[in-house]
Amino acid sequence: QGVBGBEEGLFGGR
């Protein structure tokens, strides 16, 4: 679910 810079989850991401 988007951790750090993965997708768009916990810390926003992308």
UniProtKB/Swiss-Prot annotation:
GO cellular component, one term: extracellular region
Residues recorded with modification Pyrrolidone carboxylic acid: 1
Subcellular location(s) per record: Secreted
Main location: secreted
A biological process term (GO) from this entry: blood coagulation
Highest taxon of the lineage: Eukaryota
Assigned keywords, A-Z: Adaptive immunity, Blood coagulation, Coiled coil, Disulfide bond, Hemostasis, Immunity, Innate immunity, Pyrrolidone carboxylic acid, Secreted
PTM entry text: Conversion of fibrinogen to fibrin is triggered by thrombin, which cleaves fibrinopeptides A and B from alpha and beta chains, and thus exposes the N-terminal polymerization sites responsible for the formation of the soft clot.
Oligomer status and interactors: Heterohexamer; disulfide linked. Contains 2 sets of 3 non-identical chains (alpha, beta and gamma). The 2 heterotrimers are in head to head conformation with the N-termini in a small central domain.
Function: Cleaved by the protease thrombin to yield monomers which, together with fibrinogen alpha (FGA) and fibrinogen gamma (FGG), polymerize to form an insoluble fibrin matrix. Fibrin has a major function in hemostasis as one of the primary components of blood clots. In addition, functions during the early stages of wound repair to stabilize the lesion and guide cell migration during re-epithelialization. Was originally thought to be essential for platelet aggregation, based on in vitro studies using anticoagulated blood.
This protein's domain notes: A long coiled coil structure formed by 3 polypeptide chains connects the central nodule to the C-terminal domains (distal nodules). The long C-terminal ends of the alpha chains fold back, contributing a fourth strand to the coiled coil structure.
The protein's name: Fibrinogen beta chain
